[in-house]
Structures are given as C-alpha cells and as structure tokens.
Amino acid sequence: MTPAPGGAPAIRLRPAHPGDLPACVGVWHAGLTEYGVRVGRPAMPLTSGPLLRLLGHLLATDPDGFWVAVADAPGAAGAVTTHDPAGAEGPIIAFVSALRREHVWFLSMLFVQPGHQERGLGRRLLAQVLTGSDDATHATCTDSAQPISNALYSRFGMVPRLPVLELVGRPERPVTGLPDGIRAVPFDLLRAGPTDGAGPRRLAAALELLDRGALGYAHPQDHAYLGAQGRQGYLYEGGDGSVVGYGYASEVGRLGPIAVEDSILMGPVMGHLLGSVRPAGAFSAWVPGSASAAVAALLAAGLRLEDFPALVCWDRPFADFERYVPITLAVL
C-alpha cells in the first residue's frame, strides 16, 4: 500500500476478482467520458454488457495480468464503488489488464478514475503487470490524442509505430467480392458434429496456421470467445482446398478479426464480410493503416473515418498488419 499525503486515501494494488468487473466498467466509462470532454467528443452512453463480457474474458484467460487499485477509505472523491458485500475495503479507482499470447505480452486496458490521474498510479499498475515478462515482445494500442499515456508506454519500450483507423457506417455502394476460385465456408458448417471430429480439427488447424503467419502467434482462446459472442466466422479456401484466409462479422456490426495469406485478398474478404450480414446498426472496424486494401474497400463501400486514429505500439515487430485486422484495440 502506498501512503498518500495530506489525508488523501492510500492506494493499494491487488489482483482483480470477478466481482470487481462492474466497478472497472465504471472507471472505464468515467475515464473515457472525461477524456471525451477534453477533445470535444460527445458523452458516451453507459452500455456495460459487451464490456463486462470482454473484461470477463480477459480475467478468465489472464488472471495474473488483471489488477485493480483500491482506495483505503470508502467514498473517495469521484471513485466508483466496487462489488464488496462485506464493506471491507474502499472503492476501485483504477485497473489494468494485460494478456500473454505465446511470446507476445499485450496491454489491453489501463484506466484511472478522473481525480486520481497524473499521480503515478498508471505507472504503478503497468509496472505490476509487466513483472516477469522480460522475455516477451511488448505491445499495446493507444489513442493518438493521449500524450501522457503515449509517453508512459514509450518509456517501457512500447513506441507508437502504426495508425489504426476506425471506419463506421452502412454500405452505400457495392464493393468487389471474392475472386473466382475462392469460396467462403462458414465456421458453423465446419463445427457441426463431434467437437473432436474432422471439421473442428481442420478449422482449429487453419486458424492456427493463419494466425501464426499474419499475427505472429496462435490464440484459440480468443477465437472461442468470438464464437461465444455470436460473431460469424468464415474460412476462405482456394479451388484446390487450400486455406487462404478467415474473417468475422456480426449482427451488431463488428468486422474482424481478419487474417489472409496474401494481402491482395484483404479487400475482397472485407467486401464479402460486408455482404454476409445485415447489422442492426452500422458496421464498424478498426483497420491498421498498412492494411490498405481493407481500408480502400470500406471507404469505397461508403463507410467513413471516425475521430482520431489509434496507434499500435511495440518494442519489437511481431505481426504483419498488412494481412491482419484485429478483434478490438483491447485484444488483437
């Protein structure tokens, strides 16, 4: 526990528990709302369901990388009350989540409650979850309009390298579909039958091959999460049955992740995904600037660029972002 001067509550770091996640959502929302006011963005609605599920996934797969900061006195100014039935501790005022996928360590989220920022708390949390990761490549995604965060991550070697563009909207014009000889096979078709059958085994092997080639590591746990959240996946095959890519879309409009063997397929795969579902609202995707064929396909369809770009930061190269579109900024 770190003592605080002037009667301010002391701050204690501890591993997160499932009951902490609603308070983490509150910290996340408060931090983004305050940031939005500073940069002229509209207030964000508090929709906790999808974020709670994402935080639950991060905690389940990487509990050692998920920590919270707790103020020792309940009712600290502006803090969000955590799930603490016994009333034994104060509110959660910050949290961090980092995941490890093979040789890559990735900072998913780091949020500090307004009123407790710029006091070194983010650095403390980051140092905590970096412990034991000296052998890893370190990476994160950050907002280009966050100079303090970008400076912090750079001090730990995670230097901004690549813009990630947010594209949003409904298709207004047709775009190029899959070329002759390439077919899309729904994941659901491959998953039919026994879980240890030929279809599921072939799908798992194909995803691993594509992920290692484009992203630099396999992450079957994240594919399982996408399936549980209802994202619709497609495996793309050549005329000889060879696997050339995969992609996801969803009825809520999220596009990605996408991985392809050849970057020339990124545009056609994105075009196919745009036509594969009719979302309740708009489509949205976070697309690396180097995935130029995907960016061009979305712009040609009528989607628009939103806000400031995000930045992928790393200390060592690990992925070919010309051939990969991430899940979110929190989980590549």
Indicate residue ranges for each PLM-predicted region.
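Active-site rim helix/loop that mediates acceptor-substrate recognition in acyltransferases
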Residues: 2-4, 21, 26-88, 212-232
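A short, well-structured alpha-helix characteristic of acyl/acetyltransferase catalytic modules
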Residues: 2-8, 18-37, 175, 191-210, ...
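Conserved beta-strand in the GNAT
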Residues: 66-68, 78-99, 106-111, 240-256
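Conserved GNAT acetyl-CoA-binding A-motif
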Residues: 104-109, 132-146, 278-289, 308
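Conserved acetyl-CoA-binding loop-helix of GNAT-fold acetyltransferases
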Residues: 109-112, 117-131, 150-155, 263-276
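Conserved catalytic-core motifs of GNAT/GCN5-like acyltransferases
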Residues: 139-142, 159-173, 305-316
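Conserved active-site tyrosine of GNAT-family acetyltransferases
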Residues: 149-154, 158, 296-300
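Amide-forming acyltransferase catalytic core, primarily the GNAT-like/NAT-type
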Residues: 155-253
